[in-house]
Structures are given as structure tokens and as C-alpha cells.
Amino acid sequence: YEIGVRLVGSEMCIRDSKPGVSTEEIDRWVHEETVRHGGIPAPLNYEGFPKSVCTSVNEVVCHGIPDEEQILKEGDIINVDVSTIYNGYYSDSSRMFCIGKVSPEKEKLVKVTKECVEIGISQVKPWTPIGNMGSAVHKHAVENGYSVVREIGGHGVGVEFHEDPWVSFVSEENTGVLMVPGMMFTIEPMVNMGSDEIYTDEIDEWTVRTEDGLPSAQWEVTVLVTETGCEVICW
């Protein structure tokens, strides 16, 4: 199981994501690498999603659909969200990549969003409310001048792609379910440079964008609550 959930294809994306590459190529790399290791790309055909990975560039918050006509260019930031089924279990993780030299503003957004996830991990403790974690994540984002998407959050994961609990990253301390040993869920705040307002593309019904057109960033990990804290299953 542990081997399977780490089959996320991210190292290949790190090596090959550069100006001139299409998001369709990234999809193909991840698909081929996942299958080569005996896994199944979880997003493919999930509720009608047409590709094996989500590629979200700049103002796209999440669920971007890979496209051969979408070519990465210098200064872009992209989130590659890779989910895998292996031996009947699901994993879910994503990373941000800076394409070539990006602006200091985008670079800071990517950095702070990763810090939000690291803070979230540090707050995963058995028998404490899950809202403590979400509150700490939100506080760090706001202190750096950013907003956090409210409508989309983390989720349980394991034998199903999306399970309980729902994980908000705009929450209050001492609220929500207790984190108990054996619980597994994602920490995946979507942090916007501007407003937290978002909308879903009416044509493809998947792509979520910021309402103001400013960039968004997201890192995602799957964590397992243990008796003493947590284990990061995949990043």
C-alpha cells in the first residue's frame, strides 16, 4: 500500500516541466508512468473527467484539463495534481512548478502556499479537532496578504477517491470532527493572490478559476493520523 500511494509521477514533472511543453504532454507522462508501475490514474473518467491528471496554470485554481494547445511559457506557475489507484487504494497529491523565471509575486505565493501545508501537517494530532489545522493554515495565508478558497477543501481518501471528513482551510479552532488514529485525509489549501472568489468554467464544467484573474497556488499531501501525530503518505 505504501509503495502504491507514492506512485504519483511528480519527479518526472519536475524534470520535464519547462517552457514549450504542453499540459497534454504532462498528462501523457503521468499516465504512462503510473501504468508502468501497475497503477491506475484515478482522475481518468472520474465523474466524466477526461484526463489522467489535473493541470492548473496561473489563475486556474484547480481541475484544469490538460490540452495540447496549452503551452507552458516562461513565468507561468502550474499545479500538477496526481491521484493514483494501486492495489485498490487511492492516493492524492499535488505540487506547484515554476516555469522558468517567474515574478517575485508568483514565487512568494507558491512559497507561502507550501508553508501553509507544512503548518497544516504540524497541526495534525490525534484526538484534536480538525478545525485547529484549518485555522492555522488560513491564518498563515491571511498574514501574508492572501485569501483561501472556501468552497473547495480537503477530503478523506483511502478505499474511495473522496471520503469523509470534509476538510476546510477556512475554519475556526476547536471545531470539526476529531482527528483519530487511522484517519487519512488530504491537506490541500488553495491560496489566491487576490480575492477568494472563484467560478467554474461553464463550457468544460471542470476548470475552476479565480474571479479576479489573479494567480492561485496549491500544494497537496495525503496524511495518516497516528497515535503520536501523523505520517505524510505522499507529497
Predicted ranges, named:
Residues 48-52, 154:
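Short Gly/Ser/Thr- and Asp/Glu-enriched loop/turn motifs at secondary-structure junctions
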Residues 1-9, 13-14:
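Single conserved hydrophobic/aromatic residue that forms the stacking wall/gate
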Residues 11, 36, 88-96:
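Active-site microenvironments in enzyme catalytic cores
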